[in-house]
């Protein structure tokens, strides 16, 4: 029997780290552009500033460690950390907030463990959690009013606000997030009165629904390109939706399903943050448990905790559990019996 002979290469190797990071950064562009349209130039400025800070901080540590800069910086992992943290920050947060959070993320959440591939926690979320706990005022009073409700500041105005704390008009940039607004307003009102507020449109968070749909589109691109798998995003969103349906059926007490899915950092967290290949679970079953845990914790912290958008803390808590999940969910190796976990084999 004759076999066809084809040209090499015959085996397809794994994607390079640089290409993976570049695809993830590219997939954030729809969400970044949507946020810029609805909330102004602040987010774009934050992303650029955070990316530059991340590269500078990584170069600083690599120099101290006497490692080649070009080899390590070209993987774009530092840039991705800056992009994700910049997207998570309030659009008009002071420049030093972005600088401190990004530098801490790179130095103390990534490089101190040995660099890419060794960090047990998501660096961007470590930086975000540090900022939220240390500087709560700066992290909660610089959210922007969406475009339909206020005139969006121009680039120079946004730049002046971020770097020189210039006054650009209180109504132009100061407001609480929709999740925070709903959680506090529902205490003294009903769902109908809360949804009548200007920040809510068609019973969703005005502007934020399009932001989340844009990040969803970027996440689907990553799945299509096989940069990530479906396990973590689907299990996280399914768990969040299930908790909302089972525990949040009374809209006069708890935020409804559509707010949990289409407000805040839900889609950004599901497709770009929770799927971090280093700090997340790696086995297929482990990813399902991991994503479900992130979704459940997100709902619990949003509903009964002090931080309405709880994705960062949910991801960090599940980072603790990732090694445990991987240990107990590894598939059986072909040709071997599955050993009992925790029992020494003779």
Swiss-Prot record:
Entry's localization field: Cell inner membrane
Biological processes annotated in GO: electron transport chain; transmembrane transport
Entry EC number(s): 7.-.-.-
Modified residues (FMN phosphoryl threonine): 177
Transmembrane segments: 25-45, 71-90, 120-140, 204-224, 227-247, 254-274, 288-305
Descriptive protein name: Ion-translocating oxidoreductase complex subunit D
Keywords: Cell inner membrane, Cell membrane, Electron transport, Flavoprotein, FMN, Membrane, Phosphoprotein, Translocase, Transmembrane, Transmembrane helix, Transport
A Gene Ontology cellular-component term: plasma membrane
Known partners and oligomeric status: The complex is composed of six subunits: RnfA, RnfB, RnfC, RnfD, RnfE and RnfG.
Matching NCBIfam families: PRK00816.1, rnfD
Protein family (similarity comment): Belongs to the NqrB/RnfD family.
Function: Part of a membrane-bound complex that couples electron transfer with translocation of ions across the membrane.
HAMAP family xref list: RsxD_RnfD
InterPro entries noted in UniProt: NqrB/RnfD, RnfD_bac
Annotated source species: Hahella chejuensis (strain KCTC 2396)
Pfam families named in the record: NQR2_RnfD_RnfE
Topological category with respect to the lipid bilayer: Multi-pass membrane protein
């Amino acid at each position: 029997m004759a076999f066809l002979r084809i040209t090499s290469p015959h085996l397809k190797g794994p994607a390079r780290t640089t290409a993976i990071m570049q695809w993830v950064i590219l997939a954030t562009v729809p969400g970044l552009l949507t946020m810029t349209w609805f909330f102004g130039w602040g987010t774009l400025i934050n992303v650029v500033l955070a990316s530059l800070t991340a590269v500078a901080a990584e170069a600083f540590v690599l120099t101290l460690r006497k490692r080649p800069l070009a080899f390590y910086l070209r993987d774009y992992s530092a840039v991705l950390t800056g992009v994700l943290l910049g997207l998570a920050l309030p659009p008009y947060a002071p420049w030093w907030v972005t600088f401190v959070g990004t530098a801490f993320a790179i130095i103390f959440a990534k490089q101190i463990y040995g660099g890419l591939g060794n960090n047990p926690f998501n660096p961007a979320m470590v930086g975000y959690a540090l900022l939220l706990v240390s500087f709560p005022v700066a992290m909660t009073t610089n959210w922007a009013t969406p475009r339909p409700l206020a005139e969006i500041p121009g680039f120079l105005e946004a730049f002046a606000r971020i770097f020189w704390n210039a006054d650009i008009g209180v109504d132009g940039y100061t407001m609480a997030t929709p999740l925070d607004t709903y959680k506090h307003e529902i205490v003294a009102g009903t769902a109908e009165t809360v949804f009548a507020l200007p920040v809510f449109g068609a019973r969703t968070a005005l502007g934020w629904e399009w932001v989340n749909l844009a990040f969803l589109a970027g996440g689907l691109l990553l799945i299509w390109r096989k940069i990530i798998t479906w396990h973590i995003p689907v299990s996280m969103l399914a768990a969040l939706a299930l908790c909302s349906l089972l525990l949040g059926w009374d809209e006069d007490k708890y935020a409804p399903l559509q707010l949990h899915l289409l407000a805040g950092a839900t889609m950004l967290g599901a497709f770009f943050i929770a799927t971090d290949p280093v700090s997340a679970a790696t086995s297929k079953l482990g990813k399902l448990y991991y994503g479900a845990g992130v979704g459940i914790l997100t709902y619990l912290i949003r509903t009964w905790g002090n931080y309405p958008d709880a994705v960062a803390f949910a991801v960090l808590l599940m980072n603790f559990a990732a090694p445990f999940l991987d240990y107990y969910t590894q598939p059986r190796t072909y040709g071997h019996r599955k050993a009992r976990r925790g029992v020494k084999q003779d």
